[in-house]
């Protein structure tokens, strides 16, 4: 799984001119699933995101997690995180899982985060979405569970 996480003051996602998800202080997670991802990958990624200490403490140091600051989560599925641009000018997305696999994994990710007590909003899988956010920092971090299998997590 791949995720781009952004610390936000607020964020929202709109489908067909209707806001389908919005949060205040917290993290926007752009999430993609690969064909080889497992439930274990999903849980490890969610735990990493929820516990990353990327929110400031009283001394303005990164020392608080989303859980610590009772922040919120907005999860938006984005298969384009698996774009392969090595050949030609049109990206290939063969590294992304098919919707039949990806959609339940994204749903499980959201359910897991909610199960950890995190207020979690989401976009609409497969829809054309407009995402608005106010970056806080900015703080943007890329996570890839495939790298963790090789000792880089």
From Swiss-Prot:
Its EC number is 3.1.1.96. Its main location: cytoplasm. One of its GO terms (molecular function) is Gly-tRNA(Ala) deacylase activity. GO terms for biological process: D-amino acid catabolic process. It comes from the Bacteria. It is found in: Cytoplasm. CDD domains: Dtyr_deacylase. Keywords: Cytoplasm, Hydrolase, RNA-binding, tRNA-binding. It catalyses: glycyl-tRNA(Ala) + H2O = tRNA(Ala) + glycine + H(+); a D-aminoacyl-tRNA + H2O = a tRNA + a D-alpha-amino acid + H(+). It holds the Pfam family Tyr_Deacylase. A motif (Gly-cisPro motif, important for rejection of L-amino acids) lies at residues 137-138. One of its GO terms (cellular component) is cytoplasm. Gene3D superfamilies: D-tyrosyl-tRNA(Tyr) deacylase. A Gly-cisPro motif from one monomer fits into the active site of the other monomer to allow specific chiral rejection of L-amino acids. Homodimer. An aminoacyl-tRNA editing enzyme that deacylates mischarged D-aminoacyl-tRNAs. Also deacylates mischarged glycyl-tRNA(Ala), protecting cells against glycine mischarging by AlaRS. Acts via tRNA-based rather than protein-based catalysis; rejects L-amino acids rather than detecting D-amino acids in the active site. By recycling D-aminoacyl-tRNA to D-amino acids and free tRNA molecules, this enzyme counteracts the toxicity associated with the formation of D-aminoacyl-tRNA entities in vivo and helps enforce protein L-homochirality. PANTHER family: D-AMINOACYL-TRNA DEACYLASE 1 (PTHR10472:SF5), D-TYROSYL-TRNA TYR DEACYLASE (PTHR10472). Belongs to the DTD family. This is D-aminoacyl-tRNA deacylase.
